[in-house]
Structures are given as structure tokens and as C-alpha cells.
Amino acid sequence: RRRRKQPVRRALVAWVAATDALPILSSLIGALSRDNGPELMYLYMWLFWAWIVTVPPRLAFYAFNFVNLRRTGYVAACAFVLFALWGTTRGRTSIRVNRVEICSDRIPEAFDGFRFVQITDMHVGTLVRPERELTRLADSVNAQRPEAVFFTGDLVNIRAGELDERTTALLRRIAGPVWSVTGNHDVGTYIKDSLRFPAAGEAREVVARQRAMGWTVLEDTTVYLRRG
């Protein structure tokens, strides 16, 4: 029996060591990679997913098992795995609309009933299913029947190439005038290979591709809206 259990134990030890080493592996890949484009970001995402569904559940089991609550440990570990799976699938892509009524004496009466939508942080370069996710987002925005849409930064994750023709075509589905500003991800802050992809050039390209979609990009600019 001991001999039969040895291969199982060895496999278990190897599995534990491999999953524990995933953060180290990610760090090594990042250190050795010349660039950090979308492909590398996807790899990071999958490595993190593999870690989150293995190591924290195992630690939860260890904690309960330490106080002689093994069954509770199994339940806690399984619950954590299910929660992580939900978070990385349904939870990550769920859209929640928060409706806020703004009342102020500084708002002209002409804007009574004015409806706008504010969206932010799309990070289109790391969407798992861009077509489905951006279509749902556009439909959700359009369903609010806004008179204006404000995008408040971080359209891309790393660089301008993430705004390819397919992505921009999907974003054009957002109805109504769209005003946007750039975020820290949009201006090349996190580009690693800055020789091939200079931050200033990438920032200009992100702005240019937004304007090509019909968006109004505000760069140190003030715009006054008039109604009625």
C-alpha cells in the first residue's frame, strides 16, 4: 500500500510545488521578456487564474484541517474555487448600472432631465471575449438612452495596437456623442519596449484612433454643453 501511495504523494508534492511557484514563474517571464504586449498579458492572466483556483483554496483547507475541521476545510476550499470560477467568468463580465440623480443649483434648468452615461477602464487588450463583452457594453449604454457619454480613461491596457479594426468597430456601436479623456494606461506608462513603442507616439495613436471612432478626446480642454 505504501508503494502504491508513493506515486500519488509524489504527484501531489509536485503539484503543490508547481502551483506555489506560479508567482515566481510570472516574475521570471516578465523579467526575461523584452516586451509586455497583449500576448504576455493574457499569459499573466491565465497563470494568475491557475494560482487563484489552487493555492488559496488549499491554504483554506490547511487552516481548517489544523484545528481538526477537515470536512469544513473541504467545504471552504470548494467554495473558494467556485467563487473564483464565478468571479473570473460571470462576475468579471457582469455589467451593473448605477443610476445617480444629480441635483445642484449650479446646473441650468435647461438640463433638467439631461441623461448621460459615464464608463471607464475598459482595458480592451485584456478582454477574453472582446466581441461579446464590448457588444454587451454598447447595448447596455444605449439602453440608457443617454444624451452624452463620458469615457474617463484607460481604454487600452498597454498600447494603441489593442484598438484594432474589430475593436473600434464594436466601440462605434455606442450611440450618441462620446467625450473621453486618457488614463495612465492610455499614455504608454506601462510599455516595456519603449524603443519600439515610444510612449508619446503610442499616446498620440490612442487619441487618434478614438477620434477616428467619432469620439471627442479632451486634452487639457474645457467643453461647455448647451441644451435647449
Q: What does each model-identified segment do?
A:
Residues A110-G228:
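Soluble catalytic domains of enzymes that build or remodel membrane lipids, polysaccharides, and related
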